[in-house]
Design a protein with these regions (language model features):
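N-terminal regulatory/sensing modules of transcriptional regulators
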Residues: 354, 360, 378-380, 386-446, ...
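Tandem amphipathic alpha-helical repeat scaffolds
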Residues: 9-24, 47-64, 87-104, 127-144, ...
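Single-residue signature of alpha-solenoid repeat helices
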Residues: 28, 68, 108, 148, ...
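Structural signature of tandem alpha-helical TPR/SEL1-like repeats
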Residues: 27-34, 67-74, 107-111
Length: 520
């Protein structure tokens, strides 16, 4: 019995579409090719135009950009001949994606914008949502956060009205809207959006949105982080993207808490799940930068303790991470690809953390991070200023350090970025930046315990906090940005003022007086 070729073509085209959704690019390309071959070019048919457009997508995802571009152009010609304008518009989105791969992000955005407007005029929701997602994503990559938020919001509303909020593009538009406001510092709005990203998830779509909520949870130090992790972990095996988002942010969460071992474990697990066939891509940059920060912290602690062997081992491990970040930026599979603003900012941060791990906390490197993110990326610029202030303080550039520190602290307080605020206040106390904390009745000059400790200066109190924490003179010097000899003098003065015979006795007196040990 003869099979209807039009029906067979439609079946193969739909098969290709769904195989593409499952990331089976090779099988999808084969099915789409059959869909095209089943129908002749003449007479013009909408089904053949649709098959050509889908084949273009499968070729693109299979990595054959030249053939994909040719097929997309053929799809547009066939669509015009068959009076299928929605297919012509859909192929335009594919051409925009191909322009990005050819290193033409501005041209790509123009094509996405054109396709979005055409799809709206045609009232073709499926094509409209695809174009909206690509347009919003490209706007986010270019650093135009306001435009990205507006496009994602509009597209998301259209998806929601059609009951597609958890369908692929509806879901993607929700998280792009949220990410744009996370990046631009509109955290109240981002928080309202994240309120809809439930913690107790039961589906893969819900889990992906919940993973996105970790951006804000981690940056604000929310207690919801641990519960989200518990609910998300079962979904990681089936959703590599969701796992990438969640574990990378959980690494940042551990880093804020000073738990470098857990941070590195999350980074290692994330890297292990990445597809490295043909080399790393841009997503590795952020994860590698977080790992480099952890390696840098461990290397600095080792140097402060005089453990050069451990410090050298940390540098060796950090080399692997910076190599991964640089490879991701080069993107061997798409050598013409141009990194967006966020990607360039994280690459600059990775380079600065690499220098820090080697013992060179370079102010110029951190200044480059601040400038690369720029004022639009409110939070990332603020936390880059934190590192810049630290580097400037270590270099003895106190006025510059205080300026960067003050700018970062103002943003941290405005956003409610609690972990960053804590880190900045710790830096301010150690490097003596800004006004000292106010003191209440009966308190010492830094607001701490009084009476037996009343004779200590604010700097001696900081040294004593570190003594209580068991730090050596060298570690105290590193923590407070002073010379080891100066630290030794402070310790001697403290022992004399407290009439203590040893460091241990001084620490015991301080503990009895209620002085809390320094963190770390």
């Amino acid at each position: 019995e003869d099979t209807d070729p039009v029906l067979a073509s439609r079946v193969h085209e739909r098969l290709a579409y769904y195989l593409l959704e499952l990331d089976a690019a090779s099988d999808a390309e084969a099915a789409a090719r059959v869909a095209v071959e089943l129908l002749p070019a003449d007479p013009p048919r909408k089904e053949r135009a649709r098959a050509l457009a889908t084949h273009a997508q499968t070729l693109m995802h299979a990595g054959d950009e030249a053939a994909a571009s040719k097929r997309a152009q053929q799809a547009r010609v066939a669509a015009r001949a068959a009076d299928a304008p929605w297919v012509e518009t859909d192929a335009l989105v594919t051409l925009g994606m191909l322009a990005e791969r050819e290193g033409e992000p501005a041209q790509a955005l123009d094509l996405f914008t054109q396709a979005y407007r055409e799809a709206q005029a045609l009232s073709m929701l499926g094509v409209e949502l695809r174009a909206a997602f690509q347009k919003a994503r490209a706007e986010l990559e270019s650093g135009d956060l306001a435009a990205a938020a507006a496009t994602a919001h509009e597209g998301g509303q259209r998806a929601d009205a059609a009951g597609l909020s958890l369908a692929p593009y509806g879901l993607d538009l929700q998280y792009l809207h949220y990410l744009a406001h996370y990046a631009d510092g509109c955290w109240n709005h981002a928080g309202e959006l994240a309120d809809g990203f439930g913690v107790r998830v039961t589906t893969a779509s819900e889990a992906r949105l919940s993973a996105m909520a970790l951006f804000l949870d981690v940056a604000r130090g929310s207690p919801a982080v641990a519960e989200r992790r518990a609910w998300l972990e079962p979904f990681w095996a089936g959703d590599s993207f969701g796992a990438y988002i969640a574990r990378g942010l959980l690494a940042e969460h551990a880093l804020w808490r000073g738990d470098t071992a857990t941070a590195l474990a999350e980074v290692a697990a994330t890297l292990a799940e990445m597809d490295v066939e043909g080399g790393y891509g841009p997503p590795v940059i952020r994860v590698a930068a977080v790992g480099l920060a952890a390696r840098g912290d461990q290397a600095r602690r080792a140097r402060a303790a005089g453990d050069d062997e451990t410090a050298a081992a940390e540098v060796t491990a950090a080399q692997v991470l910076i190599d991964a970040a640089r490879e991701g930026a080069a993107y061997p599979r798409r050598p013409k690809f141009v990194l967006g603003v966020d990607g360039r900012g994280w690459l600059a941060r990775a380079e600065a953390e690499w220098a820090r791990a080697q013992g060179r906390n370079d102010p110029e490197a951190w200044q480059a991070v601040v400038e690369t993110f720029g004022p639009a990326f409110t939070y990332e610029t603020a936390r880059s200023r934190w590192r810049l202030a630290e580097a400037l303080a270590e270099a003895g550039q106190r006025a510059e350090a205080e300026r960067e520190w003050s700018l970062a602290l103002a943003v941290a307080d405005e956003l409610g970025a609690v972990p960053l605020g804590i880190a900045l206040r710790d830096l301010g106390r150690r490097a003596r930046l800004g006004r000292p904390p106010g003191s209440g009745p009966g308190a010492g000059p830094d607001g701490g315990p009084a009476d037996v400790l009343a004779g200590l200066t604010s700097r001696e109190r900081e040294v004593l906090r570190l003594l209580v924490a068991g730090r050596s003179n060298r570690e105290i010097a590193a923590a407070l940005f002073i010379a080891p000899k100066t630290a030794s003098v402070h310790v001697s003065n403290i022992l004399a003022k407290l009439n203590a015979a040893s460091r241990g006795e001084a620490a015991a007196i301080a503990a009895a007086a209620g002085l809390t040990p320094a963190d770390g």
